[in-house]
UniProtKB/Swiss-Prot annotation:
This is Nickel-binding protein NikA. CDD domains: PBP2_NikA_DppA_OppA_like_3. The lineage of its organism: Bacteria, Bacillati, Bacillota, Bacilli, Bacillales. GO terms for cellular component: ATP-binding cassette (ABC) transporter complex; periplasmic space. It is found in: Cell membrane. Residues 1-18 form the signal peptide. A lipid is attached at residue 19 (S-diacylglycerol cysteine). The complex is composed of two ATP-binding proteins (NikD and NikE), two transmembrane proteins (NikB and NikC) and a solute-binding protein (NikA). The gene is nikA. NCBIfam families: Opp5A_nikA.
């Protein structure tokens, strides 16, 4: 009897261990991202779109063109009206059908909750009936379709019982099941996804600010896929036969952002700092060739941008400019410069700036923070900051100009303001002709550059690394999309 009981227990252990093996060999993917976010509401972060949890009405394809996503057809009968018909076979992850009324509620709630969305969508009214949606704007707004492709305009069910900040319910192939703030997101596949059954069973996303730690987690197989790979680790990953690197010349620009509310950050000071930056050296040595020196906010791969001449490092010119404001070797300018580890190259740039600035009679105090977005809200706490963002995510300059140069723009952290630049941006917003939009864009670049609103340093490549068993993830210039229903891992 005793032996029978032991045999039964042993059999049970085998069954349980077998079940464990089956689970571990399932299609589970572990992803590591930088840049913590306190909320994962779609209007607060692009993470839900990046990881396949939410979708916008439109999307950007691999060539940077806007195409339909949740939309069956659309028509613009005049400059202020957009008629949309939604696809009829799409469900939210809670089983509710995607209807025009659901989209209306989502967009209106996002505009109410987010300044970025509100100022990107100058909408006067939305009417909904069945699968048909009519959006009217306050005035001519030719880039409305492009803005509706913005991941911050992703559609979610406002009637869902869950908290949109914790577990938003979207239409993507993977449903967010649990969110531990600034630490981890757990997702499961949505079997009724409209494009087909997702290839993965589960996805776990963790936030890891330190780029070197992200690489270590990939090498140890703790993670399967990581973004924003530090350039000094690319060669190590390429030398590992179990890993692979994917690169794409990107639309992300690294920059030195100035606090225009601070009296010491005068135009002379901003010009001096602009002359201190060795853009070519930074691109060659800090980015190790995975970036190009910047001459404006926009990557020079954009064909219609007339790139200004590259500003070369000139320490003597910087000293002369600073002398105008009374700064000398005996009385140096003291600046507090903020940086963060989510993009490790930025901290290295800060250190180079600190060293070079000393030659021009500037003492830079570097402070590294965890929550860069939260920290910059207090403008009394900083003079300048390292920063990085996608300046032209959908092929048009309007997004950047409205968000970075308008006074109430969501990424105008330093409160830059020029009424003449504002007038040109307003003109751009109401201009339909594509060639004329390009001309106005170049006029804005030329006029604003006289103010030195920020110092643009480098255009960064998008660098993603993965276990060689991971297939069909996306690496795109704008860095928005990563996971879709075809992404899989071979176990």
């Amino acid at each position: 009897m005793k032996f029978k009981r032991l045999a039964t227990i042993f059999s049970a252990v085998l069954v349980l261990s077998g079940c464990g093996s089956m689970h571990s060999s399932g299609k589970d993917l572990n992803i590591s991202l930088p840049l913590k976010t306190k909320s994962i509401a779609p209007y607060e972060t692009d993470v839900p779109v990046k990881i396949g949890a939410a979708e916008s009405l439109f999307k950007t394809n691999d060539q940077g063109k806007i195409e339909k996503a949740l939309v069956k057809s659309y028509h613009q009968p005049n400059d202020t009206t957009l008629d949309i018909e939604l696809k009829d076979n799409i469900k939210f992850q809670n089983g509710q059908k995607l209807t025009a009324e659901k989209v209306k509620s989502s967009l209106e709630n996002s505009m109410k909750k987010s300044d970025l969305v509100k100022y990107s969508l100058p909408i006067s009214s939305i009417t909904a009936k069945g699968q048909k949606l009519t959006i009217k704007t306050n005035s001519a707004y030719p880039e409305l379709v492009s803005e509706l492709a913005n991941p911050f305009m992703a559609i979610y069910d406002t009637d869902a019982k869950s908290d949109v900040n914790q577990t938003p319910v979207g239409t993507g192939p993977y449903q967010i099941k649990d969110y531990k703030q600034s630490r981890k997101i757990s997702l499961s596949n949505f079997k009724d996804y409209w494009q087909g059954k997702p290839k993965l069973d589960h996805i776990t996303v963790t936030y890891q600010e330190d780029g070197n730690n992200r690489v270590r987690n990939l090498e140890s197989q703790k993670d399967d896929l990581i973004t924003d790979v530090p350039v000094n680790k690319v060669q190590d990953i390429e030398n590992n036969q179990n890993l692979k690197v994917s690169k794409e010349s990107g639309f992300r620009t690294s920059l030195l952002m100035y606090n225009h509310t601070n009296k010491k950050m005068t135009k002379s000071v901003r010009e001096a700092l602009d002359h201190i930056i060795d853009r070519q050296g930074i691109a060659d040595h800090i980015y190790q060739g995975y970036a190009k020196p910047a001459t404006s906010p926009f990557n020079d791969k954009i064909p219609y941008i007339k790139e200004p001449k590259l500003t070369k490092q000139n320490i003597e010119q910087a000293k002369m400019l600073l002398a105008k404001d009374g700064y000398t070797k005996e009385h140096p300018l003291k600046i507090k410069l903020i940086t963060y580890d989510g993009r490790p190259e930025l901290s290295k740039i800060a250190q180079v700036l600190q060293s070079d600035a000393k030659k021009a009679n500037i003492e830079i105090d570097i402070k590294s923070v965890d929550d860069i977005e939260g920290y910059l809200k207090d403008r009394s706490a900083w003079d300048a900051t390292m920063y990085s963002f996608g300046t032209i995510p959908r092929g048009d300059t309007g997004y950047f100009f409205n968000q970075a140069y308008k006074k109430d723009g969501a990424i105008n952290k330093g409160d830059y303001n020029n009424s003449n630049v504002d007038d040109l941006i307003n003109q751009l917003n109401h201009t339909v002709d594509v060639k004329e939009r390009h001309n106005i864009s170049n006029d804005i670049i030329k006029l604003s550059s006289r103010d030195v609103p920020n110092s643009y340093i480098a255009y960064n490549d998008q660098i993603v690394a993965a276990n060689s068993k991971v297939k069909n993830y996306k690496v795109t210039p704008e860095g928005i999309y990563l996971i879709d229903y075809r992404t899989t891992i071979e176990r």
